[in-house]
Amino acid sequence: MMLRGGCQRVGARLRGLRRGPRGPADGARRGVVSCIDPSMGLSEEQKEFQKVAFNFAAREMAPHMAEWDQKELFPVDTMRKAAQLGFGGVYVQTDVGGAGLSRLDTSIIFEALATGCTSTTAYMSIHNMCVWIIDRFGSEEQRHRLCPPLCTMEKFASYCLTEPGSGSDAASLMTSAVRQHDHYILNGSKAFISGGGEADIYVVMCRTGGPGPRGISCVVVEKGTPGLSFGKKEKKVGWNSQPTQAVIFEDCAVPVANRIGDEGQGFLIAMKGLNGGRINVASCSLGAAHASIVLARDYLKVRKQFGEPLANSQYLQFQLADMAARLVASRLMIRTAATALQEEREDAIVLCSMAKLFATDECFAICNQALQMHGGYGYLKDYAVQQYVRDSRVHQILEGSNEVMRMLISRSLLQE
């Protein structure tokens, strides 16, 4: 379907726990309505593309996520298959190859995909954010030149904001772009760039003017441009199916025609991109948490101690119930924020901040508790739950750390 535009291992059932879930839609196949069913409240059309995303995650991602993690493989071919379903430009306009879906639709899709591989889906969410920036703020020439190969994921994109000396204080970035005739000469470096070295298009925030946010502009730097180079591939706790490298500019000449928007508009563009990025990464946390609950539930049914299944322990039952409640609460917050962002409401920024803060904190805690329920087995890389823990941890840091989310929320309250 194309989108619119113990002590012993217990046979096959326990082997399934090692591989990870084939998709949280397993309850639906048995005719059982799960209390954590992510399709509740969705339209029939949304349920259809959600099903497509879950099936893709189960067939094309979950069987390979451990290998991608352990061998640090960037699954280019798999992502291009996902792009054939419209997942390369989910909320990009259809005239440049996007699916033209809403922010809520996007959250639904990324949650489903993240059950198959959270790390890969998170990269795809960043790629989507970059394509949206070009689609939303670029000229018609830029949109039609750059977006189509990005929507098919023939080309990949990276978002370049963070620098070695400017993380949460993004407006203090130092990468300079000095205009010389019809080019900008870039000097500086970006840190922790997802897709660094592999991506073809780098959406770069750089300083064309004075200090502060108004001196920042946005330019597209294409791979192969003289003066563009990359640092070493970082060794990370999680997110190993996507490379992370520094992006370095040394007298890198970029055509002025590659500037997105006006001079001085870059910080605004960066922040508008991040509002959606926060919803996207929080949705990836939902997928990891959902998959972890399914794994924990199934493990509790299989694993026996003191002569009976762990599922008979009321303490563990209550923990599982709390995990389910926190998952559903997170999902509701994310979907509320996604709708506000789509409608361009005044409260969208703070709702996105709240959703990102709450969901990434709670979903990481869910994944971590699911690991604890597995006991010693949860600490083995044979079992998928540990990968969901590692891959979801960084969501509390990136796209604006959760401390910054608290700053934005409190500022909004105090200004009332």
From Swiss-Prot:
CDD domains noted in UniProt: IBD
Q: Name one GO cellular component term.
A: mitochondrion
Cofactors demanded by this protein? FAD
Compartment(s) where it occurs, according to its Swiss-Prot or TrEMBL record: Mitochondrion
Give the residues annotated as active site: E399 (proton acceptor)
Where substrate is bound, by residue? S168, N275, G276, G277, R278, R411
Function as written in the Swiss-Prot or TrEMBL entry: Isobutyryl-CoA dehydrogenase which catalyzes the conversion of 2-methylpropanoyl-CoA to (2E)-2-methylpropenoyl-CoA in the valine catabolic pathway. To a lesser extent, also able to catalyze the oxidation of (2S)-2-methylbutanoyl-CoA.
The family annotation for this protein states: Belongs to the acyl-CoA dehydrogenase family.
Q: How does it assemble?
A: Homotetramer, formed by a dimer of dimers.
Q: What is this protein called?
A: Isobutyryl-CoA dehydrogenase, mitochondrial
Upper lineage is: Eukaryota, Metazoa, Chordata, Craniata, Vertebrata
